[in-house]
C-alpha cells in the first residue's frame, strides 16, 4: 500500500451567500473591437483553402485596421508613443457587385470601334425623336435630352398629380362593378363583320387636293370657318328614335363607342350615361358635358397643368384643339355654290333654316355582336375625294395641333416635319395615344376609306388664336390601326363586356365612369333625375362650335 501515492482530497470553495466562485477572477481582460458587418468564416480549415486573388480580405475584419487601434499587452511604458491622428486609409469591406453594372459584355456601351467608346454610326447617328447622341470627353456617350429628369430615379421624385373626376359621385349612387384595365385588356370579341348601312343623311363636299402640297416652305394660315356642327346626343337624335322602334337593342354614337372601346388608353376621367328600358340600352352623354372636347397631351409624361387663365392649361388647350379640328376639317374642302357635292339619301336631320351647317355626312350603321345584341350607331364622314378609278372615297378629316414644343419636350415640327415626319408622328402617338386611337376607331366604324391628318401649329407659341397648316398626311384606317397597335377584337370585347353588364341590371339609369386616378372603369346605379338639372341648357350644348369665329 505504501507504493501508491496518497489520495489528497481537492479543495472545494463553498459560497455561503450565493452560488459560483467566491473570488472574482482577473478583470483586466483586453477588449478586441469588431465590426458587425464582418463575414463569418471557418474557425479552422483543415483543407488548406486557396485564398481568393480578387478579394484577399474577404474574411478579414474591417474594424480597427489602423495600427493605433491594435491592442498590445505590455506592462511597462517603454513602448509608449504618440498617436498619429492622420491615420491610414481603411480597407473597404468586401461587398458583392450588386449595384455595379457588368460592363464586360455590354456591347451597347463599347460598340465595335473601341473598348469604351460607343459607335455612333452603328446606332444610326440619331434617335427616333431627332436628338443626336453627343460624345463627351474620354469617349463617354451621353444623351442630352431630358436632362431635367436625370436626377430622378425611375420617377420616384415625380410629384403625384391628383385629377378631378368628370362628375361628382353622389352619396345616393350605388356602385355595381369595378373593372380594372388589365382585365379589360384580356377581352376579345373576334369575327365582327363590317357595319351595314340602314340610313344615310346629309351631304359632303369634295376634298381640295392642293392641301396635299402644303409643306414647311408653303404653309397656309388656318382660317376661321363660320359653320355650325351639332353634337346631338343619342336619345335626342330623331333618326335613332325612329330606328329604335323596329330594329336594334343597343344605340349609341361613334364618339361614345370610341371612348368606351379605347378606354384602356385614357388617363383623364370621362363618363357615359346608360339608360336601360326593357331590352333596349341607350348609351348617352350628359348635357353641358366636356365630352366633345379633344384632349391634348393626355398620355404624355408631363400633361398640361390645370392653371386658370393660362393659354396652356388643359381646358384651354382642349378648346383650342377642338376649334382647330373643326376649322381644318372645313377649310380643306372645296366650298362654294358652284362646287359639286355628294348627296346622301336623306337630308341632314339637324338642319335649321338660316343656319350654315358644316359638311358632315351621317351614316347609321348596324352590327351584330352575338347573343341577340344588335348595335346601331350614328357615324359620320367629313368629306369625299375622287378615287383613281373614278369612284368616290369617304374621308375622316382630323387635325393635330402643336402649341409649344419646348414646354412639351417633343419634336419641333418646323424643323422635322418635312425630313422626319415619322419621328413627328411617333411623338404624337406617345403624347396623344388615346385621341389618335379614338379617331381611328371612329373612321373604322364609319367605313371611311382614308383618314386625313393635318399638322397645325401656332404662329407664335404665345398666341393661341392664330395658326398655320404645316402639312397633311393620309392613312387607311385599318392599316393605321395596325401601326398604332390598336386591336379591334379587344375593342369590341370591351364594349360587349360593358353591354352584358348593363343587360343583367334592372331597368333604370346607370353611369359608366373612368376613375380619375386609377386605371379602372366603374359602373354606378344613379337615380332617374340625376342629371336633369343640366337639361335646361340643352340648346346651348347642342352646338358648341357655332360661335367658333368669335375666338
Curated annotation (Swiss-Prot):
Pfam families noted in UniProt: eIF-3_zeta
Keywords: Cytoplasm, Initiation factor, Protein biosynthesis, RNA-binding
Ranges of compositional bias, category Low complexity: 121-136
Top-level division of the source organism's lineage: Eukaryota
InterPro entries from the UniProt entry: eIF3d
UniProt similarity note: Belongs to the eIF-3 subunit D family.
Protein's UniProt name: Eukaryotic translation initiation factor 3 subunit D-2
Encoding gene (name): eIF3d2
Amino acid at each position: 500500500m505504501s507504493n501508491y501515492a496518497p489520495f489528497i482530497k481537492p479543495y472545494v470553495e463553498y459560497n455561503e451567500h450565493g452560488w459560483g466562485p467566491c473570488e472574482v477572477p482577473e478583470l483586466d481582460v483586453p477588449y478586441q473591437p469588431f465590426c458587425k458587418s464582418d463575414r463569418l468564416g471557418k474557425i479552422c480549415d483543415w483543407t488548406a483553402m486557396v485564398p481568393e486573388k480578387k478579394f484577399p480580405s474577404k474574411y478579414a475584419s474591417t474594424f480597427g485596421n489602423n495600427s493605433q487601434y491594435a491592442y498590445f499587452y505590455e506592462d511597462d511604458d517603454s513602448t509608449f508613443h504618440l498617436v498619429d491622428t492622420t491615420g491610414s486609409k481603411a480597407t473597404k469591406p468586401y461587398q458583392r457587385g450588386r449595384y455595379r453594372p457588368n460592363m464586360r459584355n455590354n456591347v451597347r456601351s463599347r460598340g465595335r470601334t473601341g473598348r469604351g467608346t460607343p459607335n455612333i454610326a452603328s446606332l444610326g447617328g440619331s434617335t427616333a425623336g431627332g436628338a443626336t447622341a453627343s460624345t463627351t470627353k474620354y469617349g463617354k456617350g451621353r444623351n442630352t435630352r431630358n436632362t431635367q429628369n436625370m436626377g430622378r430615379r425611375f420617377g420616384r421624385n415625380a410629384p403625384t398629380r391628383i385629377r378631378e373626376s368628370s362628375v361628382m359621385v353622389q352619396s345616393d349612387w350605388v356602385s355595381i362593378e369595378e373593372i380594372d384595365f388589365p382585365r379589360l385588356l384580356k377581352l376579345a370579341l373576334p369575327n365582327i363583320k363590317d357595319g351595314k348601312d340602314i340610313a344615310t343623311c346629309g351631304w359632303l363636299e369634295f376634298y381640295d387636293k392642293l392641301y396635299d402640297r402644303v409643306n414647311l416652305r408653303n404653309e397656309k394660315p388656318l382660317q376661321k370657318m363660320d359653320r355650325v356642327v351639332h353634337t346631338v346626343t343619342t336619345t335626342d337624335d330623331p333618326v335613332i328614335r325612329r330606328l329604335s322602334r323596329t330594329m336594334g337593342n343597343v344605340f349609341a354614337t361613334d364618339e361614345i363607342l370610341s371612348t368606351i372601346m379605347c378606354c384602356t388608353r385614357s388617363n383623364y376621367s370621362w363618363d357615359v350615361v346608360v339608360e336601360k328600358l326593357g331590352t333596349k340600352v341607350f348609351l348617352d352623354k350628359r348635357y353641358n358635358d366636356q365630352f366633345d372636347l379633344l384632349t391634348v397631351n393626355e398620355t404624355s409624361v408631363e400633361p398640361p397643368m390645370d392653371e386658370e387663365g393660362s393659354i396652356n392649361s388643359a381646358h384651354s388647350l382642349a378648346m383650342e384643339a377642338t376649334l382647330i379640328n373643326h376649322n381644318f376639317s372645313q377649310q380643306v374642302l372645296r366650298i362654294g355654290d358652284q362646287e359639286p357635292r355628294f348627296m346622301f339619301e336623306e337630308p341632314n336631320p339637324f338642319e335649321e333654316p338660316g343656319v350654315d351647317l358644316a359638311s358632315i355626312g351621317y351614316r347609321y350603321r348596324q352590327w351584330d355582336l352575338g347573343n341577340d345584341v344588335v348595335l346601331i350607331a350614328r357615324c359620320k364622314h367629313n368629306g369625299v375625294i375622287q378615287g383613281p378609278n373614278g369612284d368616290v372615297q369617304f374621308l375622316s378629316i382630323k387635325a393635330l395641333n402643336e402649341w409649344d414644343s419646348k414646354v412639351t419636350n417633343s419634336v419641333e415640327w418646323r424643323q422635322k416635319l418635312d425630313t422626319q415626319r415619322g419621328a413627328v408622328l411617333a411623338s404624337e402617338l406617345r403624347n396623344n395615344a388615346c385621341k389618335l386611337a379614338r379617331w381611328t376607331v371612329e373612321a373604322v366604324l364609319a367605313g371611311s376609306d382614308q383618314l386625313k391628318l393635318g399638322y397645325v401649329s401656332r404662329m407664335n407659341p404665345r398666341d393661341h388664336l392664330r395658326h398655320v397648316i404645316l402639312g397633311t398626311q393620309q392613312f387607311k384606317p385599318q392599316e393605321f390601326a395596325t401601326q398604332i397597335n390598336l386591336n379591334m377584337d379587344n375593342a369590341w370585347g370591351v364594349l360587349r363586356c360593358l353591354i352584358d353588364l348593363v343587360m343583367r341590371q334592372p331597368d333604370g339609369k346607370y353611369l359608366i365612369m373612368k376613375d380619375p386616378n386609377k386605371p379602372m372603369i366603374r359602373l354606378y346605379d344613379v337615380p332617374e333625375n340625376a342629371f336633369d338639372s343640366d337639361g335646361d341648357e340643352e340648346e346651348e350644348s347642342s352646338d358648341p362650335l357655332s360661335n367658333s369665329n368669335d375666338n
